[in-house]
Design a protein with these regions (language model features):
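Extramembrane terminal tails and long inter-domain/linker segments of multi-pass membrane proteins
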Residues: 1-8, 18, 174-188
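N-terminal topogenic module of multi-pass integral membrane proteins
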Residues: 1-53, 57
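Structural signature of hydrophobic alpha-helical transmembrane segments
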Residues: 34-47, 93-105, 128, 154-158
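Alpha-helical membrane segments in multi-pass integral membrane proteins
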Residues: 101-112, 122-143, 149-170
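Helix-coil boundary and interhelical linker segments in multi-pass alpha-helical membrane proteins
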Residues: 26-35, 85-97, 143-151
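Membrane-helix exit/interface motif
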Residues: 27, 52-56, 78-90, 109-116
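Helix-adjacent hinge/juxtasegments
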Residues: 66, 70, 74-103
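Membrane-helix interface "capping/anchor" motifs
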Residues: 7, 56-64, 115-126
Length: 188
């Protein structure tokens, strides 16, 4: 077995993140109920697929990709568990303020990860910046019990998710065609 070039796992992780983020934030802006579609995406595409992408980033020696994808994949799995376990009678419903603290911790983590993007593509920077803002607003909205803030956060989440999908498609198409099809603001 010789040196086999590994495929880029980032588009898989970015799509899992982006699509699941859009679906959850369609709920946050009030378009859809928090139902099985969002939960299933949270488990399988947002959760498991991102963790798989992170493990492939590990194989490539990419600490940032490993940390980002396995962490956010775990975020989706824990969020689904937080929302689903009370419905299964396994625990009480989450306290909104404590959910805000949970989201705030993810915001702090994301802020530090944002600093790790500053040598990367501009679109990646935007994904992490908008995700930091999203987590901050969701944390504040839950802690304060303010539905308007959560609703506004949903719009930020839609933009964040769409930017992650754009980045994923940029990486796929730019590699596939060997040229810039979708500009992602590559660092030089």
């Amino acid at each position: 077995m010789g040196n086999t070039k590994l495929a880029n796992p980032a588009p898989l992780g970015l799509m899992g993140f982006g699509m699941t983020t859009i679906l959850l934030n369609l709920h946050n802006v009030g378009y859809f109920a928090l139902d099985g579609i969002i939960r299933a995406m949270g488990i399988f595409y947002g959760g498991i697929a991102q963790i798989f992408a992170g493990l492939l980033e590990y194989k490539k020696g990419n600490t940032f990709g490993l940390t980002a994808f396995t962490s956010y994949g775990s975020f989706w799995l824990t969020l689904v568990a937080i929302l689903l376990m009370p419905k299964l009678g396994l625990t009480d419903a989450p306290n909104a303020q404590f959910l805000g603290v949970y989201l705030g911790l993810w915001g702090v983590f994301t802020l530090f990860m944002f600093f790790g993007t500053l040598k990367g593509a501009r679109v990646l920077q935007f994904v992490f910046f908008s995700l930091t803002v999203l987590f901050a607003l969701l944390a504040i909205g839950n802690i304060a019990g303010n539905a308007a803030i959560i609703h506004f956060a949903g719009w930020i989440g839609l933009i964040c998710g769409a930017s992650a999908i754009y980045l994923a498609m940029g990486e796929v198409l730019n590699e596939q065609f060997g040229r810039t099809v979708l500009p992602i603001g590559e660092s030089h």
